[in-house]
Curated annotation (Swiss-Prot):
Gene: rpsL
Molecular function in Gene Ontology: rRNA binding; structural constituent of ribosome; tRNA binding
Family: Belongs to the universal ribosomal protein uS12 family.
Role description: With S4 and S5 plays an important role in translational accuracy. Interacts with and stabilizes bases of the 16S rRNA that are involved in tRNA selection in the A site and with the mRNA backbone. Located at the interface of the 30S and 50S subunits, it traverses the body of the 30S subunit contacting proteins on the other side and probably holding the rRNA structure together. The combined cluster of proteins S8, S12 and S17 appears to hold together the shoulder and platform of the 30S subunit.
Assembly and oligomerization: Part of the 30S ribosomal subunit. Contacts proteins S8 and S17. May interact with IF1 in the 30S initiation complex.
Protein name, as recorded: Small ribosomal subunit protein uS12
Length: 123
């Protein structure tokens, strides 16, 4: 425990919390342009071809973003909306593309959990 004299000379340091999503700069989402759309393989116990795109954001950052859901329509110059949220088995992928906004289409024939994939209510 520090004495009052020590605290007067040098006050306590504030603990600075580090952001998990620095490229968003405290915004809920950011817009960007796809520079590359590709598939990549996950870490050790899992096996798949995960859909990922490289996105240049409006604030100048370039990040990798995961494209969730079955099938997508993204190409090289598509304009996408990025939200935070990492993919645990893809190292370096700390963002998700928002389905159903800007150039990203919603998932077709999606019946459950539709709001997460930008799918309209089936008639």
């Amino acid at each position: 425990m520090a004495t009052i004299n020590q605290l007067v000379r040098q006050p306590r340091k504030r603990v600075v919390e580090k952001s998990d999503v620095p490229a968003l700069q405290n915004c809920p989402q950011r817009r960007g342009v796809c520079t590359r759309v590709y598939t990549t393989t996950p870490k050790k116990p899992n096996s798949a071809l995960r859909k990922v795109c490289r996105v240049r954001l409006t604030n100048g950052y370039e990040v990798a973003s995961y494209i969730g859901g079955e099938g997508h329509n993204l190409q090289e110059h598509s304009v996408v909306l990025i939200r935070g949220g990492r993919v645990r088995d893809l190292p370096g992928v700390r963002y998700h593309t928002v389905r159903g906004s800007l150039d990203t289409s919603g998932v077709k024939d999606r019946k459950q959990g539709r709001s997460k994939y930008g799918a309209k209510r089936p008639k």
